[in-house]
Amino acid sequence: KNPEITIGIFSHVLSTSKKFVRQIQRALEDRRLYELFPDVLHEKPPQRFWSADAGLIVKRKGNPKEPTVQAAGLVDGQPIGAHYDLRVYDDIVTQESTSTPEQIEKTTSARKLSLALATAAGGRAWYAGTRYHPMDTYQTLIDRKALKPRVRICMDKDGQSVLMADDKLKKLRTEMGERTFAAQMLQQPVGEGMRTFQDDWFQTLEKLPAPEKLNRY
């Protein structure tokens, strides 16, 4: 809709964000898309500024220093002096980046630095990713009301699979294990060393025992 827009795609590391740019590149090279938007897309990809490394530039009137779409790493490869109308944070948190409190803080601090890469008007920011730890960078953003969470999981409210057949999801859960399944498929991370309550741990008492028989702490 706006060929003048500049977009920075941020992932935890640069190599991951380049994969997203390559996917966009293939889509923009589709002949059918060019026939719909010949005033924006190139009939033949240009030799310069049409790669995951250099970024992608569509036909535009302005001449900003930023490509139309550019890959960026959050903790490695953050651009210097670039300012984007839209920053897309996709997979800025990984399982490895939540292995220690120091790694979590490194990601959180890098995200703060990336805020300077917005335009003077502030720009927009989108976030998409998977939770791997209850105190990860995403939780910090939620606590600060820096974003509005929209959680999409593999089940509906009745516990029925919306992603694949129920038997396949059950098998996947068994093979993944509860901790990985909770993070990857339910967006409910459980930190290392932490335990969640299970229903069968609780007992229902119809009558309270005498106070002298209770342990007090």
Per-range role (PLM):
Residues 51-113:
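Conserved RecA-like ASCE ATPase "motif II neighborhood" in helicase/translocase motors
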Residues 9-75:
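Conserved nucleotide-state-sensing and coupling region of NTP-binding domains
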Residues 101-159:
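ASCE P-loop NTPase helicase motor core
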Residues 8-11, 70-71, 88, 126-129, ...:
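A structural signal for short, well-ordered beta-strand segments and their strand-loop junctions
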Residues 159-217:
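ATPase catalytic-site recognition across NTP-hydrolyzing enzymes
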Residues 1-2:
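Walker A/P-loop NTP-binding motif
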Residues 16-17, 96, 133-137, 159, ...:
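Flexible loop/turn segments at secondary-structure boundaries
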Residues 19-27, 83, 106, 110-113, ...:
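Alpha-helical scaffold elements adjacent to nucleotide-binding pockets in ATP/GTP-utilizing enzyme cores
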